[in-house]
Amino acid sequence: MSKYRKIADNISVNEYSLSKFKNLECAIFDCDGTLVNVNRSYNACIKKTVGFMLERLIGGKQWYDLVSDELILKLRMSGGFNNDTDTSYTCILSALASGSKDVDTARNFALHVATKANYQGIRSVEEYLTKSGNGDAVKKAKNDLNYPGLVGSSILSTVFDEFFYGKDLFLKMHRMQPRFNNSHGFIDNDEVVISDDTVHDLSKLFKKKMAIVSGRSRLAIEYSLKKMLRNFNLDASIFIEDEEKEVIANHLQIRVNKPEPYALLKAMKALNARSAISIGDSAEDIIMSRKVGEKYPTVFCGVYGTGIDSDAQFKMFMDRDVDAIIENVNLLPVLLRSTIK
């Protein structure tokens, strides 16, 4: 018998979690796949970046067809790939380690590698490939791409950001002229999912205690969500891309990426909240919320309708026993009013 109760169309609540919805002080949102559909922006950027880099490294136009939606989804479901440049790096590394110039063979190998990934992200992939006799490929990829590394020093980080942001935003973001893209960016293909009505409704429910915890930069969030951000506390929001750059530049020993609890805890502290509902679409969002839940009452609500494979995403949420599942972030007010009665 299912432990999930359907309280409305496309809204399911874990019966064991119903009591957790009482007295939630704030709402903290993931952006990509939750507030914004990124299938034609970030996902497309991964595919182009990987093709571009492999063409430079080993030649051939076939590499633009390497990355499939299935491959991206498998990596994201591992819980360690909130950063899409990490995803691009893993796809490139897997293609190199496959030892084949046949794109189908390389893709199948990459899909196999994705099954070995876990919440440790690229570290888990590098360790698996090294142990399986592909240490030379790992060294080559790290050296050729200088990754992980900042834009300007790592060619992979630079290419990804140029393709995603486009000429003008890249210049604004990094204060350097682009070298690989003199046109618009994939960010222009972002599709905002959350409606103005939903944002206003939630802002009233939480008395304006709403923030965003996203792998994006603040610039990218502001560019896509525009005036809608007035209803979020941006001072309490955490933009992990920006935070990570500070960590790398200052050689700090802090892990800020999801699924580490750092960003969610920092946002809650800034909102002066001791309980939260976290809304996201990925495995790392679940893991992060549960880590925070060890200290503070935290509810996780999974959003499945804007991803690559909504059925697979819904199943993942059920398999991981999340507190609530909604097809679309605009159903969140209905969920909350049904559970806090």
What is each stretch, according to the model?
Residues T34-L35, N39, I46, Y147-S153, ...:
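Substrate-recognition element of Asp-dependent hydrolases with the DxDx(T/V) motif
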Residues F21, L205-K208, A270-R274, G293, ...:
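Glycine-rich phosphate-binding loop signature in dinucleotide/nucleotide-binding domains
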Residues K226, S278-I325:
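Acidic, Mg2+-coordinating phosphoryl-transfer loop and its flanking beta/alpha structural elements
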Residues K3-E70, D86-Y89:
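Active-site neighborhood of HAD-like aspartate-dependent phosphohydrolases
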